[in-house]
Amino acid sequence: MIQEDNAKKYSHAERLHTFIKEVLDKAGVAQEKLDAIAVSKGPGSYTGLRIGVSAAKGLCAALDIPLIAVETLRSLSRKQNLTHNELVAPMLDARRMEVYSAIYDSEGNVIRGTEAQILDETSFTEYLDKSIVHFIGNGVEKFQEVCTHPNARFVTSELPSAAQMAGISNQKFQEGLFEDVAYFEPYYLKDFIAGKPKKK
């Protein structure tokens, strides 16, 4: 498996197609040999999702291949190895004390679907009282500030990665679970709110 990581903010629009070419070159695969393209469907950054999905749809249309969409939180949950009866709660930073989160069991089954929620000391108590819960993602630090439950485990360093999408994408490909390229839209979860323009 080959992937390209980019930690530089606000550079996706300029660099994404270059990254795609670099990954294909490293793998020795021509665009024309691709069977499908997978993309993270959200939730997440409005701009990041829009850029990624637009690029994926454009390539699928040009190459006449199917589009596979993977939930961002589901792919993030694959980064944590669980033992039986443990849960994982992938968590992405929204604004202030808000996060996007979901809960999965050790088999990858959805225990609670994706929600936007305001965090406080009682968040996730119904799950923490019964199981060890691994909180993972860039929204974890917010919850770590208010959660003192002994069953909470915090993994703050992990971000969504294309590598974790591979297994899910392959399964969807085998099952023929494709999106309509013309009409597919990212799962923003919340309406876009414009911020102040960045200073140049």
Give a label for each model feature.
Residues M1-K41:
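N-terminal beta-alpha supersecondary unit
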Residues A7-R15, Y46, R50, S54, ...:
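Residues at secondary-structure transition points
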Residues V23-A27, A62, Q80, A162-F173:
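Stable alpha-helical structural segments in soluble proteins, enriched in small hydrophobic residues
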Residues R153-K200:
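Acyltransferase
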Residues A36-L67, T72:
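DPxDG-like acidic metal-binding loop motif
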Residues S11, P66-P160, Y188, I193-A194:
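Surface "functional belts" at beta-alpha junctions
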